[in-house]
Design a protein with these regions (language model features):
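Charged catalytic cores and adjacent phosphate/nucleic-acid-binding surfaces used
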Residues: 1-10, 21-64, 102-103, 116, ...
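Active-site beta-strand/loop signature of hydrolases that rely on acidic residues for catalysis
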Residues: 13-19
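Active-site gating loops and adjacent loop-to-helix segments of metal-dependent hydrolytic enzymes
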Residues: 55-99, 143
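Alpha-helix-centered segments that form part of catalytic cores
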Residues: 85-121
Length: 215
């Protein structure tokens, strides 16, 4: 995945597996090899079946948050024959174990609790693919809640999104890549050579503006 990101001309990417950050260490190591900055993160499923992205400044915070999220998953084991293997990778493409719980399940945390958990580890919560029918905030809840505020949201490419949901918000454009061929080419360009810290600072600053930035 990281190598393909380099081929696509991407300088900074986020790795956000479902309900775990356990593969972030290997992704960051691969990023050093390929010259790609990797932001450690997760895509957490709330009990309402809403996907919330969590971006973290450091690997340790992401891993600790990931352990707490994993504890909130139901004790339902993955069935590889049905859902595929949930591999932990090390040293490139070398499998180093598996995770037992089925990661695509919802946690027992509400949307608000997921956001609070991410923030408690210094992370940035961002609603994922809000305009996608499944697991997007609009499709799952029927609306974009007024509170907590979501100044930054992610939208899914090629799917219409209501204007009220995006007005005044900073939009991240998602490839939501689960396969190599899904990885998009760059959407945003920063004036200076970007780093992961630059991207996180931009998102955090936009989040801090809150409702002041909205019409």
């Amino acid at each position: 995945m990281v190598g393909m990101a380099r081929v696509k001309g991407l300088d900074v990417i986020a790795i956000t597996d479902h309900n775990t950050a356990r593969n972030a260490p290997d992704a960051i190591a691969a990023g050093r090899e390929y010259g790609v900055q990797v932001i450690p993160g997760m895509e957490i499923t709330s009990r309402e079946e809403v996907h919330i992205l969590g971006y973290f400044d450091g690997l340790d915070a992401a891993l600790r948050a990931g352990e707490e999220v994993y504890a909130h998953l139901p004790d339902i084991r993955n069935e590889p024959a049905l859902f595929g293997n949930q591999l932990l990778m090390r040293d490139g493409d070398t499998p180093a174990g598996t995770l037992e719980k089925l990661l695509i399940n919802a946690t027992d945390l509400s949307v608000e609790e997921v956001c609070a958990l991410i923030k408690s580890y210094g992370g940035i919560p961002v609603p994922a693919h809000i305009n996608r029918g499944s697991n997007g905030m609009i499709g799952a809840l029927g609306l974009m809640p007024m509170l907590p505020e979501y100044p930054v949201v992610e939208v899914y490419k090629g799917v219409p999104c209501p204007k009220y949901a995006t007005a005044g918000r900073f939009l991240l454009h998602s490839s939501d890549a689960h396969r190599l061929e899904d990885i998009q080419e760059r959407v945003f360009e920063l004036d200076a050579l970007p780093t992961a810290a630059d991207v996180l600072r931009l998102i955090r600053e936009r989040n801090a503006l809150g409702s002041e930035a909205r019409p």
